[in-house]
From Swiss-Prot:
Phosphorylated. Phosphorylation by CSK on the C-terminal tail maintains the enzyme in an inactive state. Autophosphorylation at Tyr-424 maintains enzyme activity by blocking CSK-mediated inhibition. Palmitoylation at Cys-3 promotes membrane localization. Residues 156-253 form the SH2 domain. Residues 275-528 form the Protein kinase domain. CDD domains: PTKc_Yes, SH2_Src_family, SH3_Yes. A lipid is attached at residue 2 (N-myristoyl glycine). This is Tyrosine-protein kinase Yes. InterPro entries: Kinase-like_dom_sf, Non-receptor_tyrosine_kinases, Prot_kinase_dom, Protein_kinase_ATP_BS, Ser-Thr/Tyr_kinase_cat_dom, SH2, SH2_dom_sf, SH3-like_dom_sf. Non-receptor protein tyrosine kinase that is involved in the regulation of cell growth and survival, apoptosis, cell-cell adhesion, cytoskeleton remodeling, and differentiation. Stimulation by receptor tyrosine kinases (RTKs) including EGFR, PDGFR, CSF1R and FGFR leads to recruitment of YES1 to the phosphorylated receptor, and activation and phosphorylation of downstream substrates. Upon EGFR activation, promotes the phosphorylation of PARD3 to favor epithelial tight junction assembly. The gene is Yes1. Keywords: ATP-binding, Cell junction, Cell membrane, Cytoplasm, Cytoskeleton, Kinase, Lipoprotein, Membrane, Myristate, Nucleotide-binding, Palmitate, Phosphoprotein, SH2 domain, SH3 domain, Transferase, Tyrosine-protein kinase. The active site is at 394 (proton acceptor). It is an enzyme of class 2 (transferase).
Length: 541
């Protein structure tokens, strides 16, 4: 997949604005009003978009989908993106949120709950710290610690997390009614949301969201008749009594260790000898993908490129851009071997390529709610790329990776414009993914975020057909001719017409009439409440 600086987004001719009424919290003595605010689009990377200049990239990999297999599960940082960098005026003690095994001789191993004095936190994502328990100095991943005795250090605090991601976690198999988490409110600055797993006869398993409001004097409440000095006291109260909630709080929602930002301190350009290729996962036009180990300690995915695929100098420059793109739904780039044969090291994902997962893995048995949720996750990642003014250029199931609990991440970005292969750069050559490409991009090379939207419509057909090749029975040239004449794929068997209507919006001839990824994400996240509330499982979907 390629991410490039895109043209300025124009307002579409059709305005896609879902209604987002936010119901006020009921402060009566009975059951509390549940927060029904529509999930806002959230990004794991905050702040202004980086200006990486105008780039022109082509997608990596061709039709066979040579993609790195990224991480075993989604990670949500429960720590703010940064803490105050000054350590003067008193020492702040930090506490470990997770266990960590050292990957290099410069790292510190530690256990959850261990306390640290931070020596230097001004050099990025890895901080120099001293363990109070052992007295040892070393580097620690900054997103594995939080200030001791802070809200961020509480096990139930999940920080910046959207409503939909909270629901995904709480509804994971094995979780029981009453399991909960606290997160920042998406709709009210300075407020929090309490998300609880519930069950009822009508909806079955579901999640209720309650807004935790802040008093002027610093206290907290869900209803004004029950106010608390601290968030910790509020949580403790509702673990003892439901007191108007749908259920009393039982246990904290399980989470997983977040991915570290990079493999270790200054581990970016790494020696080839530090990597061990162990299991070949796939191959394609331009290289192979392996599961392997870095430094004898860390499981990774390794993409090996055939010599001559791209210039090493250009690749290294591009990789500097790739590693700056950070989002929960993008596979992170960890490190590179920049001399030929080029190696690209990324997060390892346990379930592999989405296309294979749908055709040969457990994905064969998924029903429409799971498939729509996977599409919503992909739209979430693409909405981030949209906000960053980049484009993907090769969005399809072969470039999406799957982890535990059906977590999906977008892979393979930033490389394609560097590929030196006539069968690819010709756009209509054998290695170019014509069936996924918008006509203006295939015919005239006009790649924009709106051509990505077209590709997303095709990807939706891959999901609901469990990996069927688009335009069955048609060869590439025929597809291009028919699409130019106005042909669009019919509604796949078992697919609701409302979902097919979204596909057709993505396939509008005029790129400006196609929806934004922000709209697509919102539509898919609320699909079974706003669009198809009467859905009943069928034979295949």
């Amino acid at each position: 997949m390629g991410c490039i600086k895109s043209k300025e987004n124009k307002s579409p001719a059709i305005k896609y604005t879902p209604e987002n009424p936010t119901e006020p919290v009921n402060t009566s003595a009975g059951h509390y009003g549940v927060e029904h605010a529509t999930a806002a689009t959230t990004s794991s990377t905050k702040g202004a978009s980086a200006n990486f200049n105008s780039l022109s990239m082509t997608p990596f990999g061709g039709s066979s989908g040579v993609t790195p297999f990224g991480g075993a599960s989604s990670s949500f940082s429960v720590v703010p993106s940064s803490y105050p960098t000054s350590l003067t005026g008193g020492v702040t003690i930090f506490v470990a949120l997770y266990d960590y095994e050292a990957r290099t001789t410069e790292d510190l191993s530690f256990k959850k709950g261990e306390r640290f004095q931070i020596i230097n936190n001004t050099e990025g994502d890895w901080w120099e710290a001293r363990s109070i328990a052992t007295g040892k100095n070393g580097y620690i991943p900054s997103n594995y610690v939080a200030p001791a005795d802070s809200i961020q250090a509480e096990e139930w605090y999940f920080g910046k997390m959207g409503r939909k991601d909270a629901e995904r976690l709480l509804l994971n198999p094995g979780n029981q009614r009453g399991i909960f988490l606290v997160r920042e409110s998406e709709t009210t600055k300075g407020a929090y949301s309490l998300s609880i797993r519930d069950w009822d006869e009508v909806r079955g398993d579901n999640v209720k969201h309650y807004k935790i409001r802040k008093l002027d004097n610093g206290g907290y409440y869900i209803t004004t008749r029950a106010q608390f000095d601290t968030l910790q006291k509020l949580v403790k109260h509702y673990t003892e009594h439901a007191d108007g909630l749908c259920h009393k709080l039982t246990t904290v929602c399980p989470t997983v260790k977040p991915q570290t930002q990079g493999l270790a301190k200054d581990a970016w350009e790494i020696p080839r000898e530090s990597l061990r290729l162990e299991v070949k996962l796939g191959q394609g036009c331009f290289g192979e993908v392996w599961m392997g180990t870095w430094n004898g300690t860390t499981k990774v995915a390794i993409k090996t490129l055939k010599p001559g695929t791209m210039m090493p100098e250009a690749f290294l420059q591009e990789a500097q851009i790739m590693k700056k793109l950070r989002h929960d739904k993008l596979v992170p780039l960890y490190a590179v071997v920049s001399e030929e044969p080029i190696y690209i090291v990324t997060e390892f994902m346990s379930k592999g390529i989405l296309l294979d997962f749908l055709k040969e893995g457990d994905g064969k048995y998924l029903k429409l709610p799971q498939l729509v949720d996977m599409a919503a996750q992909i739209a979430d990642g693409m909405a981030y790329i949209e906000r960053m003014n980049y484009i993907h250029r090769d969005l399809r199931a072969a470039n999406i990776l799957v982890g535990e609990n059906l977590v999906c991440k977008i892979a393979d970005f930033g490389l394609a414009r560097l590929i030196e292969d006539n069968e690819y750069t010709a756009r209509q050559g054998a290695k170019f993914p014509i069936k996924w490409t918008a006509p203006e991009a295939a015919l005239y090379g006009r790649f924009t975020i709106k051509s990505d939207v077209w590709s997303f419509g095709i990807l939706q057909t891959e999901l609901v057909t469990k990996g069927r090749v688009p335009y069955p029975g048609m060869v590439n040239r025929e597809v291009l001719e028919q699409v130019e004449r106005g042909y669009r794929m019919p509604c796949p068997q078992g697919c609701p017409e409302s979902l097919h209507e979204l596909m057709n919006l993505c396939w509008k001839k005029d790129p400006d009439e196609r929806p934004t990824f922000e709209y697509i994400q919102s539509f898919l996240e609320d699909y079974f409440t706003a669009t198809e509330p009467q859905y009943q499982p069928g034979e295949n979907l």
